[in-house]
């Protein structure tokens, strides 16, 4: 099997009555999901006239319909381009302008985002249906285009093939054999992320039921875990914190849990210990990026001891990682450089960004932008971020984008945006601002000013005012110097 559509067809033949997905009290078998997604795929081709390779943007919270559309688009030979529903209409339009979709599909509450973006828009309820599986999925074709970005803050589409997705799923199944046929996997990460969209496919690839949660509400999440007898889950540390802090967690029945994977944000040893005590199951840390189709390295439960707790693990089956210097020369163990990776889950490239693809993938090795080292046994230890991306609660925030907004304030002379440690979110956004002379700019007024210009997770949670920003002799801003006081005492400064 080389496409996600093939996975669904095969599962529908092998176990047609096995529950494929559960969402808000309703379920579909693999056979039912296969049939319904085929009807949408046929209509997209026959009634809407979409051609192989056309992009279809999706804006909504998690749902069974979202998953159904993933399969339908692949069957029709189309590319799914999920967009973060938390973005403002203005921000969503920037992504749509880059993706150039032939169709935008939204939930009913986000139709205005699609309309504002200027593209042809249908809600899930309005999608046409009817016809047989067009079977236009092709090995090697792009299946998903997830939005990612560099330190410029400009959107880039990471193009992932069906085999990229399935290869990660096979590697993950070896790391977590508890993801099994007939099992129940919690799917609570946003489907517009590789961690959400990927996890739901990887669970179904193994034959598990995807138990989808629309959005993260701690009480609802806890109730779902207990009532649905969840066996496996992918969580971010913020979710683990929410769950372990709920009073009901002290008496909840978590006995069905077999294995929890966590990642996408820094985690404290104290929270990890508390989570292990609460859920009483195996834990694996995952490390990867959108460009690597999610995780390429894992720290298994048996390695959650001693110094290894600071590691993000070793490359999973079939992948290779190394640490290189600025000249791409491999470094010896324990010498810090840039972590690079190669494997079959490496993206096809950035959408319409040939030069940026060439810059990121050199000699077959993807440059992660993360600084770290490897020990003598191949465990990766991350130290800092070469790229300036801030990871807050599993969401990527690009400082240049936030800085551009804040610089639009008439009382801001200069600003720099950095990530600072936070026990709940891993990191939060901090703005360091040089105000114009004679103004009365305050922290509260600047944050409020950004409210309708930035999504909530991008807005600064705090603002420091300074007389000048630190720069070197050539005038380059020294963000490391800005970050240092806030990160003092932290051994690890990156997800």
Identify what each model region corresponds to.
Residues 87, 104, 225, 233, ...:
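AMP-binding/adenylate-forming catalytic core of the ANL superfamily
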Residues 166-184, 192-232, 245-246:
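Conserved AMP-binding/adenylation subdomain of ANL enzymes
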Residues 26, 43-90, 396:
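Conserved AMP-binding/adenylate-forming
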Residues 16-17, 130-147, 154, 164, ...:
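Conserved pre-ATP/AMP-binding loop-to-beta segment of ANL
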Residues 29-31, 143-170:
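Conserved AMP-binding A3 loop
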Residues 17-18, 32-57, 87-88, 93, ...:
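ANL superfamily AMP-binding
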Residues 6-29, 58:
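AMP-dependent adenylate-forming
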Residues 205, 230-235, 245-307, 320, ...:
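Gly/Ser/Thr-rich phosphate-binding loop
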């Amino acid at each position: 099997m080389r496409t996600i559509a093939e996975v669904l067809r095969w599962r529908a033949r092998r176990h047609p009555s096995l529950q494929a997905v559960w969402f808000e009290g309703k379920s579909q078998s693999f056979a039912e999901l296969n049939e319904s997604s085929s009807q949408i795929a046929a209509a997209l081709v026959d009634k809407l006239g979409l051609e192989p390779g056309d992009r279809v943007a999706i804006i909504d919270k998690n749902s069974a319909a979202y998953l159904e559309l993933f399969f339908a688009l692949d069957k029709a030979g189309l590319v799914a381009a999920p967009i973060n529903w938390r973005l403002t209409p203005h921000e969503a339009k920037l992504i749509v302008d880059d993706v150039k979709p032939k169709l935008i599909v939204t939930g009913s509450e986000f139709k205005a985002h699609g309309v504002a973006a200027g593209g042809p828009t249908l809600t899930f309820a309005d999608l046409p249906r009817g016809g047989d599986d067009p079977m236009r999925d092709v090995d090697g074709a792009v299946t998903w285009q997830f939005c990612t970005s560099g330190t410029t803050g400009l959107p880039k589409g990471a193009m992932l093939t069906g085999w990229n997705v399935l290869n990660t799923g096979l590697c993950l199944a070896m790391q977590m054999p508890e993801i099994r046929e007939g099992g129940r996997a919690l799917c609570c990460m946003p489907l517009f992320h590789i961690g959400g969209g990927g996890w739901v496919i990887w669970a179904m690839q193994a034959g598990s039921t995807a138990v989808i949660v629309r959005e993260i509400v701690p009480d609802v999440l806890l109730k779902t875990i207990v009532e649905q007898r969840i066996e496996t889950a992918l969580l971010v540390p913020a979710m683990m914190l929410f769950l372990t802090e709920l009073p009901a967690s002290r008496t909840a029945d978590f006995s069905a849990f077999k294995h929890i994977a966590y990642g996408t944000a820094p985690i404290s040893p104290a929270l990890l210990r508390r989570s292990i005590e609460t859920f009483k199951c195996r834990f694996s840390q995952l490390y990867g990026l959108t460009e690597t189709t999610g995780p390429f390295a894992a720290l298994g439960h048996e390695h959650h001891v001693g110094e290894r707790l600071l590691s993000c693990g070793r490359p999973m089956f079939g992948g290779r990682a190394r640490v290189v210097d600025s000249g791409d020369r491999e470094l010896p163990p324990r010498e810090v450089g840039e972590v690079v990776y190669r494997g079959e889950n490496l993206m096809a490239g950035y959408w319409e960004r040939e030069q940026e693809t060439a810059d990121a993938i050199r000699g077959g090795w993807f440059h992660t932008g993360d600084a770290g080292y490897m020990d003598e046994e191949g465990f990766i230890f991350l130290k800092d971020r070469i790229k300036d991306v801030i990871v807050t609660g599993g969401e990527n925030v690009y400082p240049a984008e936030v800085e551009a907004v804040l610089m639009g304030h008439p009382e801001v002379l200069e600003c720099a945006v950095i990530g600072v440690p936070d026990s709940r979110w891993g990191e939060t956004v901090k703005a360091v601002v040089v105000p114009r002379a004679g103004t009365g700019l305050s922290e509260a007024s600047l944050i409020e000013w950004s409210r309708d210009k930035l999504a909530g997770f991008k807005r600064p949670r705090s603002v420091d005012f300074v007389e000048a920003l630190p720069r070197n002799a050539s005038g380059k801003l020294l963000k490391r110097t800005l970050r240092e006081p806030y990160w003092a005492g932290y051994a690890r400064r990156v997800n």
